[in-house]
Design a protein with these regions (language model features):
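Conserved, mostly hydrophobic/aromatic
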Residues: 24, 41, 49, 61, ...
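Short, acidic/polar
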Residues: 29-42, 85-102, 122, 147-151, ...
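Acidic (Asp/Glu)-rich catalytic clusters
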Residues: 13-16, 40-43, 62-73, 95-104, ...
Length: 187
């Protein structure tokens, strides 16, 4: 099977940013298998790779992306763990993620879970700063409720492009999907 390019992969658009519809979630992958599977997924046409600090596999994901030779065609998403959302911790952790991934930029940086102990305005301020400084192309959230989506979109100085949530026929998320649509975000 020949590889497809990112521009030919089916995508959704949020606020001018195109996100491949199908992505490889790496939450259960570890070690050499993670690197090999990531590389092979890209070679057969996957153009979105999803990882997170909590998965403890950013190094292997980055290895697989680089080994594919197709970095410019692949969107890499990573997520900041909730215990690292305070401004100093967040900035340091994003730089550590980039170092582990060994990439020049993160394509999409998400807050993995909200942390009620850290003011959202502070977290989003640092995420916007990381975008302005070129550490990430876009920012978004994961596992946010409708009320948190409303608050985040009200206070963020940068557009939030998505709320990554579990969504399938056995888990109705219509209210969150509706809130995302209202704010021009994708799920």
């Amino acid at each position: 099977m020949s590889a497809t390019t990112r521009k030919h992969a089916p995508t959704v658009e949020a606020k001018g940013f195109r996100i491949p519809i199908v992505g490889l979630g790496t939450w259960s992958l570890r070690g050499r298998d993670c690197a090999r599977l990531t590389e092979q997924a890209i070679r057969i046409g996957y153009r979105h790779i999803d990882t997170a600090q909590m998965y403890d596999n950013e190094r292997e994901v980055g290895e697989g992306v680089r080994a594919s030779g197709l970095r410019s065609e692949v969107m890499v998403t990573t997520k900041v763990q909730p215990t690292l959302l305070a401004p100093h911790d967040l900035e340091r952790s994003v730089k550590e993620s980039l170092a582990k991934l060994r990439l020049d930029v993160i394509d999409l940086l998400l807050i993995h879970w909200p942390n009620p102990r850290v003011p959202l305005v502070e977290t989003l301020g640092v995420m916007a700063k990381m975008k302005h400084e070129g550490y990430t192309r876009q920012i978004g959230v994961s596992n946010f409720t409708v009320s948190l989506l409303d608050e985040a979109n009200r206070i963020s100085t940068e557009p939030l492009v998505c709320d990554q949530i579990e969504c399938h026929p056995f888990l109705n998320q219509d209210k969150i999907v509706g809130a995302c649509r209202k704010h021009g975000m994708v799920v």
